[in-house]
Amino acid sequence: PDAIYMYGWSWAHSASGTAQSWQPESALPLVRVGDSFVYEGTCYVFSWAGDIAFILTNPTGNTKVELPNENFDANSSVLSGNPTHFSLPTTEGYYKISVDLKEGITISEGEPSIVTPNGSSKFTLRYTLQ
């Protein structure tokens, strides 16, 4: 996809913005960088240690496909107990959010859709304090 969408809680579009709480209609777009499978966006993270998820389809559409965390490094501190959730940093501030899907993904048709990596490399999620 050309963009993926982050939603969850304990973040906002700006420091003075309304804290988000799992509202797909106000999801943060992470835009694809060139021809890579890296997606980036910037948001403000509060210190409440929230969780997020990434939607791979239109966040307000009828079918919402979330990125499973099973294809990320199992030792990563960003993984959450929920199979599609990731933990936010606990230091408050603006962050660049970067998701690297390595060789890309394939999303199957049908209910439920299955997300499959196009290669064997583990995906990465990075938070860079700005």
Task: Give the label of every model feature segment.
Residues I114-V115, K122:
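Non-cytosolic coordination micro-motifs
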Residues F54-L56:
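Helix-coil boundary and N-terminal low-complexity module in membrane systems
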Residues S120-L129:
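Short, low-complexity, Pro/Ser/Thr/Gly-rich segments in the mature regions of secreted, periplasmic
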Residues G50-I52, Y95:
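Exposed beta-strand face motif in extracellular beta-rich ectodomains
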Residues V31, T84-L88, V115:
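Tandem-repeat/low-complexity and Cys-motif detector
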Residues P1-A49, N58-S80, L129-Q130:
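Aromatic-rich carbohydrate-binding modules that target alpha-glucans
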